A protein has these predicted regions:
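Actinobacteria-biased recognition of intrinsically disordered, low-complexity terminal regions
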Residues: 1-5
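N-terminal regulatory/effector-sensing and dimerization cores
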Residues: 8-109
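Amphipathic alpha-helical segments enriched in hydrophobic/aromatic residues interleaved with Lys/Arg
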Residues: 103-165
């Protein structure tokens, strides 16, 4: 990977994609301690390998794969190779994913991802295209590509999430 050793991240919001955070990053030594996100994580790996602890086991995502984390799901993150990993990610809100699922899939209930890693270079490319469209200010392309990507991921690797009880 070119420029090995340099860590960088750009996190932003594109006003024309409400409810979605965007990220481009490259990490070598960064270690993410156990944490959660309110939104979904859809991270497309470009180079290197990301290892993340999820569901009681280490998961490995390399080039062309996606790391997929449902909201409020504890996970970690670190490099799986000395060169680190480079990725682009979208963080759509649960409400947006539910809207897309209702319009484009047969999933009933709260939609989510079944497996935390999916090897799908086409879907990974769609995530990178969403980021590119947002950077270029192309709202129609960014929204369309995001919806196509989420639809594809839900059709290939989606299902209803288990109901969570209310704790008092």
């Amino acid at each position: 990977m070119a420029g090995s050793g340099q860590e960088r991240a750009r996190h932003w919001r594109y006003p024309e994609l409400p409810g979605v955070d965007l990220l481009r990053a490259r990490f070598v030594e960064k270690i993410f301690v156990r944490h959660t996100h309110e939104n979904f994580v859809i991270a497309a790996i470009s180079d290197g390998v990301e290892v993340f602890h999820h569901g009681g086991a280490d998961q490995y995502a390399g080039p062309g794969a996606l790391a997929l984390v449902n909201p409020d799901t504890p996970h970690t993150g670190r490099a799986g190779v000395p060169e680190g990993w480079r990725y682009g990610a979208v963080y759509p809100s649960p409400e947006l994913v539910a809207e897309i699922a209702a319009e484009t899939t047969t999933i009933r209930g709260t939609p989510g991802f079944v497996s935390p890693v999916l090897d799908d270079p086409y879907a990974a490319g769609l995530v990178h295209e969403v980021l590119r469209a947002a950077e270029e200010g192309n709202a129609l392309a960014a929204d369309t590509l995001l919806r196509v990507a989420v639809t594809r991921l839900l059709r290939l690797n989606g299902g209803p999430l288990p109901q969570r009880g209310v704790h008092t």
